[in-house]
Amino acid sequence: MTTAETAWTEAMKYENRHDPYRFFDELRKTPVVQVADKVYVVTGYRELLQLAHDPHVSSDISKSPISAQPAADAQPDVGAEHMAAYGREPSLIVSDPARHDKQRRQVMRHFAPPHSPNVIPNMAADIQTLCNDSLDKIKAGVNGPGGNTFDVVDDYAYPVPVAVICQILGVPLKDEPTFHGWIFDFMAGADMGPDAATEEGQARQQKGKESTAALTAYMADLIQGFLTEPQDNVLSKLVNDKDGPDGPMTPSEAAANAMLLLIAGHDSTVNTIAHCVLTLLRNPESIELLHEKPDLIPKAIEEVLRLQSAVQFFPSRSVTADIEVGGTVIPAGSAVHLLYGAANRDPERFPDPEKFDIQRPDNQHVGWGRGVHSCVGGPLARLEVNIALETFLRRVENPRLVVDPPPYRVNQVFRGPLHLEVEFDRITG
């Protein structure tokens, strides 16, 4: 193996999930580098932005040389398991214009400005209630035996965004334990590293495929119900929209995009809340600063998004023509991974990149992606994380980490703690 191939393989290993960044630093010595046959990774900030806006970079998973490759065949060169989660039809995240543009317009028409400017702001009160309810349950000892400790992931970061996205989409919250298990299985099975070739990894993949099929069938049944009896939620509106310029989505398109939003609600937002708490507790002086100046909380969140990108990269992209970037020519037909987590720590763009600096100037990170595939749910996620973090800081007195580093999830793309145990003096209110 070359040095780059070794660094990439190490970054993908589960044992390094808590800190892949030292291997990203090694890769960044050549900001665009080949790490496997027909697979290139991009770690430089400038180079990533160039490719994020290049029309010759395709997100159509069917064009990627790794889209149908079994995980056991090669170490990190796999994308099929990730793509399987987005239904029988490709969602907007694995599509190119014009399919992507049409689906994005259809989703945004019912989810965000200009057509639906109040959907996200109107969720603020509900989000605040969910945050308070979660802390009240912890305070009352509902979620476990005595002692002033709780799991930030299971008891706080998870319940809030999942309840919100279910309400927006029209997914019954009573079904949450079932589809939570399906999504967990899928994400654990979508392993892009060498561990996927082990017996345990193969078992995770098989379970992930079975759970993906179950989730797909569940979404199909839910959508069929909305076609029969339309309701006031985004998913129902997507398949019943007769007034929009693009018309309704097909049931399979709606299922694919609903699964995308549901998975993002389960993982990227949950991981961001957990990483905010983890980062602040690793930097206790920052908690004092935010107590004194709570108006800096949004800037603190953006700095966490830089340090701990909600999505580390996405495995569907490929190039449709030879592209020269960063002194390297990426041949047409190659897969290309834009490593947001690495670009956000590029010292040429962010001075002292390992430092957590709440007041960092010009923090134009790529934690939510860039280009046409920038995160659809970014405004909602920012609102959720802002309220969750403000409430945590206001009500949880003297929080301390119990274990550092915490255990992490298997998945490399949606990287986040599996659990985050926190000890505290008391919960106020």
Predicted regions mapped to residue ranges:
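Cytochrome P450
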Residues: 1-429
